[in-house]
Amino acid sequence: MGRKEEEDCSSWKKQTTNIRKTFIFMEVLGSGAFSEVFLVKQRVTGKLFALKCIKKSPAFRDSSLENEIAVLKRIKHENIVTLEDIYESTTHYYLVMQLVSGGELFDRILERGVYTEKDASLVIQQVLSAVKYLHENGIVHRDLKPENLLYLTPEENSKIMITDFGLSKMEQNGVMSTACGTPGYVAPEVLAQKPYSKAVDCWSIGVITYILLCGYPPFYEETESKLFEKIKEGYYEFESPFWDDISESAKDFICHLLEKDPNERYTCEKALRHPWIDGNTALHRDIYPSVSLQIQKNFAKSKWRQAFNAAAVVHHMRKLHMNLHSPSVRQEVENRPPVSPAPEVSRPGSHDSSITEAPILDPSTPLPALTRLPCSHSSRPSAPGGRSLNCLVNGSLRISSSLVPMQQGPLATGPCGCCSSCLNIGNKGKSSYCSEPTLFRKANKKQNFKSEVMVPVKAGGSTHCRAGQTGVCLIM
């Protein structure tokens, strides 16, 4: 009977009146528009987990949560974060996730001191293996990027874990058409709003591989229109001197993944058989000095520039979408001024009070060993040749969430057991949001970014602004 109930879609959630009776809240790991992720300790077992708290709200679409849960419940792979349990209260949903505490991919590269093609090859091999598993199970991730590739533990030989299934989708007849993904990693067919398939993930892996070998993205331009055209044309280069020490095998591997025609693009299965992955062609020459320098220049980016590019991409996607509708609507979109960054976006290195307060800590419980890398990168993004880097390549813009405690001292709690401030979600000023990426971040963040952009949205005959996030198409 119990097993049958677990399989029943109406009973996959455990009911709770106070989640704090089950878990001790220890640290804020990440925040989003509709959710907060905490480091928690299970009271009965003492095990550590990442708990994603999702506030129930009319502005939040249950289908988005159901999609993420449906995806996570179907998958079990050593390189994919695991959904351990699900709870529900009158005000929240709670996803109990496997704790990923080893840090982000780029941070680990910067900490290494020595870094080779072979190191990059081993990372991509794990990613390909996990994505191949997803594809075999009819799941397309749709938002693969370095920020979603985390190390399981701080140990040197830790596995890479794929996180963030907020945009994942189970294929229907192998073809999808919703425009989503993160610009800079998104495939040409998605940016052009053409029907696409699981091949979009292979393109993203190609972009990630390119960055891992040189430290900057394959597509960058000084204007958003040129950037979009470059991606849709599939035009990129292996520029000197940044690629002089990289093997021809690595370049060949990338070319097969960054193939404009999705029908000709390498699948994960083919990529796993390439000699750069499965053979001995990945060089052991140290490329750390060049790659680490470019990563610091291009990925510790100005939040103002992140917000600008986010707005440009959302505006571009909206125009493409609305062109399919009536002439009057199309004219309204054409006349709409370009979106500008919200004035409250702070600059790199500034104090972000909205993400620093944490739930009540249990001092008797040791935190996972998390490495620290002091960073102070405030320079404007650059790319080879001295040109400015306008491509948004550092992932989805995170939304500052009212779920994060703001007050000093002990937290007040609501009826759900979470902090009372989370009850503000869905109030006046909060708008609907298509999909909320799960943020699994280690407790000590390397850069204190708070990138946000306000996007004009047409609704009910009037236009209002709401927080937008690259990586999520606001038009579905």
Curated annotation (Swiss-Prot):
Membrane spanning residue stretches: none
Superkingdom, natural source: Eukaryota
InterPro entries: Kinase-like_dom_sf, Prot_kinase_dom, Protein_kinase_ATP_BS, Ser/Thr_kinase_AS
GO BP term, example: calcium-mediated signaling
Record's GO cellular component terms: calcium- and calmodulin-dependent protein kinase complex; cytoplasm; endomembrane system; Golgi membrane; plasma membrane
Activity modulation comment: Activated by Ca(2+)/calmodulin. Binding of calmodulin is thought to result in a conformational change and leads to activation through phosphorylation by CAMKK1.
Post-translational modification: Prenylated on Cys-473.
Pfam families xrefs: Pkinase (PF00069)
Cellular localization per UniProt: Cytoplasm; Golgi apparatus membrane; Cell membrane
Membrane protein topology class: Peripheral membrane protein
Protein's UniProt keywords contain RNA-binding: no
Active site positions, chain numbering: D143 (proton acceptor)
Region (Autoinhibitory domain): 277-317
The keyword Kinase belongs to this UniProt entry's keyword annotation: yes
Domain Protein kinase, first and last residues per copy: 23-277
EC number: 2.7.11.17
Enzyme class: transferase
Reaction(s) catalysed by this chain's protein: L-seryl-[protein] + ATP = O-phospho-L-seryl-[protein] + ADP + H(+); L-threonyl-[protein] + ATP = O-phospho-L-threonyl-[protein] + ADP + H(+)
Entry text on domains: The autoinhibitory domain overlaps with the calmodulin binding region and interacts in the inactive folded state with the catalytic domain as a pseudosubstrate.
The protein's name in its UniProt record: Calcium/calmodulin-dependent protein kinase type 1G
Organism of derivation: Rattus norvegicus
Classification lineage: Eukaryota, Metazoa, Chordata, Craniata, Vertebrata
Gene: Camk1g
